[in-house]
């Protein structure tokens, strides 16, 4: 029995007392690239295994929300608001009782942009737990019983950098709408400059840094990375590469890659494209059922635990509360 499973069992036994005495914290799951398949049964064994383990984790440890990091519907998104994929890839898969009232905050990936992203946004008015108000947006939370606050900036990295073909091109070439890309980047700069929260997170689909199949996203290394350092961002969360990674740069910015919700890829082909010392953890075992990141933010620190869909704890790291600007 690994330590994570033992912890889950212990906390299950102590659940009544934990409800009263647990350390106040904001807790959430970050999972990317979970979007099933376009043919029956419209989900994969890995997606089902992740849904089951997410439900178990939420039931025992709790979660205030789930952060969806894009590629919500493989391989070409959804066609309209009535697309059956909403039901068969999302609602019917993440259906455990423990998940029914947990909100999802959603952003789009490159495969979503091959379909109708506006329909995913509009679905927010139909589903009680699907929250996707606009292509990019800001979330604000307070840790219960404290004055400690958390901001999360949800980006559309596809409109920022351009779409990418997983088979023909590893890098997004250019944004389709340059004006929209500039608008989003300007919005983010202003938001980060004004952010006074104790923790500031940014989330998008494409990675800034990755050692895997797609590698670092040149557009984000050039345009986003300097903003993360300048404005003291705690961490950047993403998917796109189908594995789990944690990287940290010389400025202390954490890079949480959680793209193992539906596929697993062991590739390390871009390991030499990432600066020495950045990579702290990588997991892409082909026979694995995938996994996700579980984040807990307290008044003192932010903890990120990578969990395999089998229930095994793979890696854990901590990031400090940032100094108030």
Swiss-Prot record:
Transmembrane segments: none
EC category: hydrolase
Record InterPro entries: Acid_PPase, Calcineurin-like_PHP_ApaH, Metallo-depent_PP-like, Metallophosphoesterase_PAP
Pfam families: Metallophos
Superkingdom of the organism of origin: Eukaryota
Signal peptide: 1-21
Reactions it catalyzes: a phosphate monoester + H2O = an alcohol + phosphate
Cofactor binding summary note: Binds 2 iron ions per subunit.
Localization in the cell: Lysosome
GO cellular component, one term: cytosol
Covalent S-S links between cysteines: 161-219
GO annotation terms (biological process): bone morphogenesis; bone resorption; defense response to Gram-positive bacterium; negative regulation of inflammatory response; negative regulation of interleukin-1 beta production; negative regulation of interleukin-12 production; negative regulation of macrophage cytokine production; negative regulation of nitric oxide biosynthetic process
Residues at which Fe cation 1 binds: 33, 71, 74, 242
Keywords tagged on the record: Disease variant, Disulfide bond, Glycoprotein, Hydrolase, Iron, Lysosome, Metal-binding, Signal
Purpose of the protein: Involved in osteopontin/bone sialoprotein dephosphorylation. Its expression seems to increase in certain pathological states such as Gaucher and Hodgkin diseases, the hairy cell, the B-cell, and the T-cell leukemias.
Medical condition linked: Spondyloenchondrodysplasia with immune dysregulation: A disease characterized by vertebral and metaphyseal dysplasia, spasticity with cerebral calcifications, and strong predisposition to autoimmune diseases. The skeletal dysplasia is characterized by radiolucent and irregular spondylar and metaphyseal lesions that represent islands of chondroid tissue within bone.
Stated name of the protein: Tartrate-resistant acid phosphatase type 5
Gene, per the UniProt record: ACP5
